[in-house]
Amino acid sequence: MKELQERIVQDGKVLSASVLKVDAFLNHQVDPQLTMKIGQRFAELFAGENITKVVTIEASGIHFAMATSFALGVPFIYAKKKKAVTLTEEVYSAPVHSFTRQETYQISVSRQYLSKEDRVLIVDDFLATGAALVGLTNIVKDAGAHLVGVGAVIEKSFQEGRGLLEQAGVRIESLARIESMSPEGIHFIEEEPARV
């Protein structure tokens, strides 16, 4: 997605060869117009898949899941990192290690909202090590739901996340694939034509 790549170059900050800060427009201060375009693009990429739910993890994936679910006309669910006192029913859960926070969470989704009848699209802000997305795919599998695919807003293609998901047979669509990055610049893998 060209507009997203341009914003990453313009407003993103490379903190190291593996850390990209995009909080000026994606995951702290949020550009709502760009967010809605991202959701529309995911809806286009996964059109015809009869998706019934969009799933993400709190917090940085929520607005992308909302925009995508809005474009698809279906509900979205976000996995919680900590079990709330209001979450009294049974849950699906999986451990997830956060690269940026260096913490491991036990994410959970209520069994009430995810079932074997669902066709699920997972959406998140980053695909890097793949830990969050693998955790979410495990929850979808535990529910017996059909995983249609994963949509990542930004992919750090030089990290192992894509490989882990591909080994599991997961379809991945990333809107900005970064081949490499340094304070001197960001190199993208060029977009491939969308599947029809």
UniProtKB/Swiss-Prot annotation:
Which keywords does this chain's UniProt record carry? Cytoplasm, Glycosyltransferase, Purine salvage, Transferase
Main localization of the protein described in the UniProt heading: cytoplasm
The answer, when asked if Cytoplasm is one of the entry's keywords, is yes
GO biological process terms, semicolon-separated: purine ribonucleoside salvage; xanthine metabolic process; XMP salvage
Entry-linked InterPro entries: PRibTrfase_dom (IPR000836), PRTase-like (IPR029057), Pur/Pyrimidine_PRTase (IPR050118), Xanthine_PRibTrfase (IPR010079)
Q: Tell me the residue numbers annotated for binding 5-phospho-alpha-D-ribose 1-diphosphate.
A: 128-132
Protein EC: 2.4.2.22
Q: Where in the cell is it found?
A: Cytoplasm
Q: Per the record, what is one GO cellular component?
A: cytoplasm
Broad enzyme group? transferase
**Under which pathway is this protein filed?**
Purine metabolism; XMP biosynthesis via salvage pathway; XMP from xanthine: step 1/1
The residues listed in the UniProt record as binding xanthine, with positions renumbered to this chain, are 20, 27, 156
One annotated GO molecular function is: xanthine phosphoribosyltransferase activity
Q: Which reactions fall under this protein's catalytic activity?
A: XMP + diphosphate = xanthine + 5-phospho-alpha-D-ribose 1-diphosphate
Q: Which family does it belong to?
A: Belongs to the purine/pyrimidine phosphoribosyltransferase family. Xpt subfamily.
Q: Its quaternary structure?
A: Homodimer.
Q: Which PANTHER family match?
A: HYPOXANTHINE/GUANINE PHOSPHORIBOSYLTRANSFERASE, XANTHINE PHOSPHORIBOSYLTRANSFERASE
Q: What does this protein do?
A: Converts the preformed base xanthine, a product of nucleic acid breakdown, to xanthosine 5'-monophosphate (XMP), so it can be reused for RNA or DNA synthesis.
Name of the protein in its database record: Xanthine phosphoribosyltransferase
Organism name: Brevibacillus brevis (strain 47 / JCM 6285 / NBRC 100599)
Gene label? xpt
